[in-house]
């Protein structure tokens, strides 16, 4: 199970992202366009990957990029290309696929023939779409990580309740009472907590650990 600790102030109920980076290259009028995709969770992480690409292609004329994080935080750069011809088409490509927490960098080696603003928009947008189409995607859902101590008498009832509510048990400790650590979808977490209280006759039996985006 893949999980991502939620550190954003405004939380989405879920989003689709990519699981790993991909590569795509195409040529237009002797200009090389080399596209990379990366899963990122912060601006710091995005800038780290951008630096790696600049180091890998130090002699390229342009390192154009765009990223979307947490569904609403976005940034892009044309890196010397005419305004709006590079970074914005990349952002639009990411948004058109309803992706978040994604960085796309498109490196251009100029081939000596001007492409015009329309040609540049086309190539940067195409590079982003193609590399994102190659990237494996995953749906992440906002979950609550919690732990609870369960007595052996009620253990089977708790397991049945968790199964019906789609909760995922992460770990089980059988020392003393049974200690469960689990992930519950945010949308059903209040109901699960109430059922814990009803079954265990304890209104303070659940400890909330964190909010996380997970594959459930």
Predicted features by range, described:
Residues 149-167:
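Short amphipathic alpha-helix segments
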Residues 176-177:
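N-terminal positively charged helical leader segments and presequences
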Residues 127-132, 147, 200-216:
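Terminal alpha-helical anchor/extension segments at protein ends
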Residues 136-152:
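Short glycine-/aliphatic-rich beta-strand segments at the starts of folded cytosolic domains
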Residues 2-84, 171, 189, 205-216:
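C-terminal regulatory domains involved in ligand/effector binding and gene-expression control
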Residues 86-134:
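Active-site beta-strand/loop microenvironment that shapes enzyme catalytic pockets
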Residues 46-49, 158-161, 192-195:
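Hydrophobic side chains in well-ordered alpha-helices
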